[in-house]
């Protein structure tokens, strides 16, 4: 397994109160595989208000009940959009959305990677070559919400119990 180390620059300009990263302002050190989450509204896993809890609610068929349904959603601050997830692997990556925590990510555009979110707030990705990536243990948070999962290990496609690469963070 080869882990490329690259540096990328984002010329979005300086923003007030934006902190400089380890590589400097506007620069990103691309080192380890990771999964990032862009929270749309409320975090998907936020109890009773997040996408996982409200996505299956049925919209009433009567027009007056529909207005009441949507007004309740807006006024109570319940989530109307799923969070976007972006993952980075040594030989690629992708993005997508989870319909529920129980089903694999729907990648957009579609690819052959299998991305799963586990009950213990860890994630697993199996790439199209069968390599397995485990994320969790070390995470970045905004408030109480995880916004980035860092890779803990990469395992062989033929021998999943054999760890090829382990990542340790301070």
Regions picked out by a protein language model, each given a short descriptive name:
Residues 166-170:
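Solenoidal tandem-repeat scaffolds enriched in leucines and small polar residues
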Residues 1-152, 156-159:
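Long, intrinsically disordered, low-complexity, charged/polar and glycine-rich segments
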Residues 162:
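Conserved binding/catalytic microenvironments
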């Amino acid at each position: 397994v080869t882990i490329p180390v690259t540096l990328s620059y984002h010329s979005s300009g300086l923003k007030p109160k934006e902190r400089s990263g380890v590589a400097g302002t506007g620069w990103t050190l691309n080192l380890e595989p990771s999964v990032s989450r862009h929270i749309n509204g409320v975090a998907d896993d936020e109890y009773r208000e997040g996408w996982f809890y409200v996505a299956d609610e049925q919209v009433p068929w009567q027009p007056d009940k529909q207005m009441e349904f949507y007004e309740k959603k807006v006024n109570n601050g319940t989530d109307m959009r799923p969070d976007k997830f972006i993952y980075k692997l040594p030989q690629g990556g992708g993005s997508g959305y989870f319909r529920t925590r129980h089903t694999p990510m729907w990648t957009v555009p579609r690819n052959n990677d299998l991305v799963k979110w586990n009950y213990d707030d860890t994630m697993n990705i199996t790439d199209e070559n069968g390599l397995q990536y485990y994320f969790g243990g070390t995470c970045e948070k905004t408030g109480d919400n995880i916004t980035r999962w860092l890779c803990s290990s990469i395992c062989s496609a033929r021998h999943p119990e054999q760890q090829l690469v382990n990542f340790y963070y301070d």
